Structure formats: structure tokens, C-alpha cells
Amino acid sequence: MSLSIVSYYGSQQSKCGYCAGANCSLSHGMHAYQLDCRDYQDLIDRGWRRCGYYCYKLRNQETCCPCYTIKCNGLEFKLSKSNKRILRRINRFLRDGKRESKPEAGDGDGEADADYAIVAPEVTASEPQPQLPDKSPPVINVEQVASLATAQRKPTKQATAAAVEAPTLGSNKSSLLSSSAAAPISNKPCKKAKQMRLDRRLAKLGDSASYSTKSLTQEKTLRDFLNTDSETNKHRLKLRLIHVYDDEFRRTLPQSFALYKKYQISIHNDPPKDQDAYKEHLQATPLQNEKPWDGPEMGYGSFHQQYWLDDKLIAVGVIDILPGCVSSVYFFYDPDYSFLSLGTYGSLREIELVQSLAEKVPSLKYYYMGFYIHSCPKMRYKGKLSPSYLLCPETYEWLPLTDVIRAKLDEHKYQRLNEDPAARDVNEFLMEHLDEVKLLLGGRTRTDYKHFRQLRGTVSDDDIIIEYSKLVGKECARRMLYVK
């Protein structure tokens, strides 16, 4: 694992990007110098979210607009009539080159096409950019800390010698006996390889037979709708997935920044930002580009998925690829192509990416859409992707987004969600875990809270460290380095 290093800011108060209220958005914030992708997966499963290097978690019981982390199971995803309508519209445009000025009357299923209603991203995971704290985090040499950590992990000569001298499992009869007791050996005879091959062949024949009877009535899948490229098409749509620090990102930066600026001005009426602000918002990332042998080909980390229509960049999806999900960070597109409902199309493409990645990494089967804000009607669109799940803000368990939960949120904007009063957070940080919290002192010395307290005696910021540890959970508190 890579090293995660964070500096906790504490409680924050700012203008709300959803209801536009002044100083009513309440959150906890921290700066992430760098994050292991597994640690960030654990953090977003506790309600955290990142914007560049800044990570924040809403104080849902107090804030004006409670935010619930939402995800969709990509492998069980069901296309709605509205989804199919949009996919057919795009396929017709690619095939014939004809623009439809508006959706056909009566072709909907009760779902509004927000791209036509307010020309805004309608099924994307984009959130308003959080207001960053005024204070700057302590300056540390991340590379130096990481190299020291690597050196500390290398075995010493004494440790190596001890390992050589240690008896093997086979040299100790009692250890073999205890091993057998722990894992009972099955009495069933092992199948021969030839028999196993025959069983697999029969299973395949059975699958193909059952498929042939179902194929006539089987509905088209998301992949069926997306795989319609043809040499006779008037337009060609190509997707490119590039890491945010690749040469290809730098080469296409002028096009992506120009597109972002056009989107911000036209869609959100925001003043144009300079290129540095764009990079700080949508390129900067604390996530390390990790490429484990059992991970996806491109590895984990932060990426831009670019949509090229012929030779023109028309949309960009900013995503994090993590061990358990594709997390959508932001999506922007060319307003000239709003008739294609690119906001929804981008989400469908990102779900298809989840389905593709899950073929190699089965655990990577979820699509995270950021926050579901029920008290803000324009942000309820995220719940239309099915099946969707909301994160309980107290037990951190996932619960299906049902009409029952929607009704509860209609009654009161903050809800525990998990109705079992006995349910607890399995990753809850308790005072007995305090000694194990990892610290980084003076930008270079790694220790834990127990040794730090022995060294310093009374610790003045106990409460802050405890608050941080409760928010990130006991596992991340044990792994991540808290900068002091």
C-alpha cells in the first residue's frame, strides 16, 4: 500500500452550493497530501468526498442540506425508458447526423429531461465546489516521508536471520496438528482434471441451450445500446481514458480547459476561471496511481474520460477508479450538444466502465455518484439510476433507496436511515484504539499516539485527534499519518 498523509482542519462553515444560504453549510475538512486508493475507498464509505487535495465530510445533523453518499450497483443496473430514449437519440445522431431540436412528444415515462429543462447536467455526480479553508496546511516533504517509510518496511539483517532460523511448518509435528484442527480436510476425493474439463464443457452447453431459449425475449443491455459503431455512421464518437498526470492529459489540456470554461460560463453563469484554477479543481489529486497485479489495467487513481466527436472534444468525465468503485467527481460538456443529454449519457458510459472493469476485478462493481440531497429537488435526479443505495450517516451501512426512505426524508431532511436501533458502525473508533493512531511529527518522524504521549506527557490537542479518528474510522486512523 502507498502511504496516506493528511492534515485535519476541524469544523468548517461556508456558503451552501445547493440552497445558496450564507455560512450554513457545516462540514469537517482535511488536506490530503497523498492518499492510498484503499484508504480513500474507506473514507468515501464513511461519507467523505474530495475536491482536489481537499477532503470534506458534511455535518449532516446540523448542516442546511444533509448530503447522503449514493451509489449504484453497476452489475445489476436497469435501464429506464428515459435512458433508452437518450441512447437511441444519440445513436440516431451518430448514424444520420441529424439534430433533434427537442424530445419527441409522449416518448417519456414521467422523467424530466433536465438537459432540455434547465440545460444542466442531469444525471451526473457533479457537486458545487466546496469553499476551501483560508489557512494552509503545514508544508512537508511527502517524497522524503514516503522514502523513510519504505526504508522502515525493509527487513533488517537480524530480522532476516531470525526468519531463516525459524522452523518451517513441516519441521514441527504439533504445528501440523494445530493446522489440521483449524482447517479440517475434506473426505471427498479430488476430481481428476479430465473429469473437471468434462464438467465445464457440459455446463457451457447447458448455458448456451438456456440462452437460446431466452434470447428471443431478452432485453437489450446497456452494452448493446453503446456498441453501435459502424463505418457508415456520419459521426464517430471515441472515448479516451487518461490519467491526470499523463502526457496525453498535458497535450489535450488546451481543449479540455476551453471546454470547461465554455461550460461554466454557459451552464452555470460562473465567471471564467484561469487554467491554474481548473487544474487545482479537476487535475490535482492526492490519489496514487497504483497498479497492483490483480487490479485494472490502467491501475487505480484519478482519470479524465474524454468524449471525442470526430476530432472535437465535446465532454469530459472526471473520475476516480478505486478498489470498489468508479467514483464520479465532475462532468462537463459542450453546451452546443445539450440536445444529446450528455449529462445522462456520461453516467451511462461510466456505469458501462464499471461493468467492464468488474470483469477483471469483481469487487469493482459500484458507481458512486457523490451526494444525494433530498432537500434540494434539483439534486434528486441521482436516485433515478437503479438500483441505488444510500449510506446511513450513523452506521455506515448501505440501504436501498426506496419510496419508504424517500417518504422519511420528506418528513425530515436528516434521517439515520438504518431503522435497527441496535445496529452499530463496525469500523467505529473507540477510546481503546487511541494509542494506535498514526502520527507524523515535524514533517518527518512517524510514531503512534501511545509513544507520542510517553514522549510529550500531556497532549493539548487530544480532543482534535479523537474527533479526527472518529470521523475517519479506526482502520484509517491506524493506517493514515496524521500531521502534527
Swiss-Prot record:
Gene Ontology biological-process entries: proteasomal protein catabolic process; ubiquitin-dependent protein catabolic process via the N-end rule pathway
Protein name: Arginyl-tRNA--protein transferase 1
Keywords annotated in UniProt: Acyltransferase, Transferase, Ubl conjugation pathway
Enzyme class name: transferase
Classification lineage: Eukaryota, Metazoa, Ecdysozoa, Arthropoda, Hexapoda
Organism: Drosophila melanogaster (Fruit fly)
Job description of the protein: Involved in the post-translational conjugation of arginine to the N-terminal aspartate or glutamate of a protein. This arginylation is required for degradation of the protein via the ubiquitin pathway. Does not arginylate cysteine residues.
Family stated for the protein in its record: Belongs to the R-transferase family.
Reaction equations catalysed: an N-terminal L-alpha-aminoacyl-[protein] + L-arginyl-tRNA(Arg) = an N-terminal L-arginyl-L-aminoacyl-[protein] + tRNA(Arg) + H(+)
GO CC terms of this entry: cytoplasm
Top-level taxon: Eukaryota
Keyword Transferase carried by entry: yes
